[in-house]
From Swiss-Prot:
Protein name as catalogued: Probable nicotinate-nucleotide adenylyltransferase
Catalytically driven reaction(s): nicotinate beta-D-ribonucleotide + ATP + H(+) = deamido-NAD(+) + diphosphate
Record gene name: nadD
Biological role stated in the UniProt entry: Catalyzes the reversible adenylation of nicotinate mononucleotide (NaMN) to nicotinic acid adenine dinucleotide (NaAD).
Lineage: Bacteria, Pseudomonadati, Chlorobiota, Chlorobiia, Chlorobiales
The species this protein was found in: Chlorobium phaeovibrioides (strain DSM 265 / 1930)
Gene3D superfamilies per the UniProt record, alphabetical: HUPs
Length: 193
């Protein structure tokens, strides 16, 4: 079994996350994808609560799973009493899937700081690291010294920050996220001024 792990604040989850999940399933041959909702240490005024972010991530998984069970939302990081690091998350996932092949899915922006992450060597021992690069022109700028890191081109102009800003300005984002998440955001009154 091949298990992919994608961590993030998912504040809110959007169609870029949906596309990345489907990409992982179809092109990386991931059998199970864990979307781990992480703590947001830089909480801003217009951020959703932990429980709201987890609920929206569960809605995203429901959308992804319409074509077969594949994706699970995980709140393990939110339940920790101390800061959780990627290496801790991977140890937890390894305990759930002791014989599975693990792949950590990260965006290029996050990967650029990989050397400063806690225990990067152990991360590479626990999982293959797959970096989603923003495009071929950016992939040529990446450091090549890191072995065992796989780069794949995946360009998505969406960001949760952009969506929160648009919602705060009263703009519609209904075409940029699954309809169930759009309804949830409106029902809960999230990200408004």
């Amino acid at each position: 079994m091949h298990v992919g792990v994608l961590g993030g604040t998912f504040d809110p989850p959007h169609n870029g996350h949906l596309a990345l999940a489907l990409f992982a399933r179809e092109l990386l041959c991931v059998d199970r994808l864990i979307l781990s909702v992480s703590d947001n240490p830089l909480k801003q005024r217009r951020s959703a609560s932990d429980s709201q972010r987890k609920a929206m991530t569960e809605l995203l998984c429901h959308e992804i799973n319409r074509t077969g069970t594949f994706c699970d939302a995980c709140g393990w990081e939110l339940e920790q009493k101390r800061p959780s690091y990627t290496v801790n998350l991977l140890r937890f996932v390894r305990s759930l899937y002791p014989s599975a092949r693990l792949s950590l899915l990260v965006g290029e922006d996050s990967w650029r700081n990989f050397g400063s992450w806690k225990s990067p060597e152990e991360i590479e021992e626990l999982a293959d690291v797959v970096v989603f690069a923003r495009g071929a022109e950016h992939m040529t700028e990446r450091p090549d010294a890191v072995s065992g890191i796989r780069f794949v081109e995946f360009s998505c102009p969406l960001s949760s920050t952009m969506l929160r800003g648009r919602i705060a300005e009263g703009q519609s984002v209904s075409s940029l996220l699954p309809s169930s998440i759009d309804r949830y955001i409106r029902r809960e009154g999230l990200y408004g001024e």
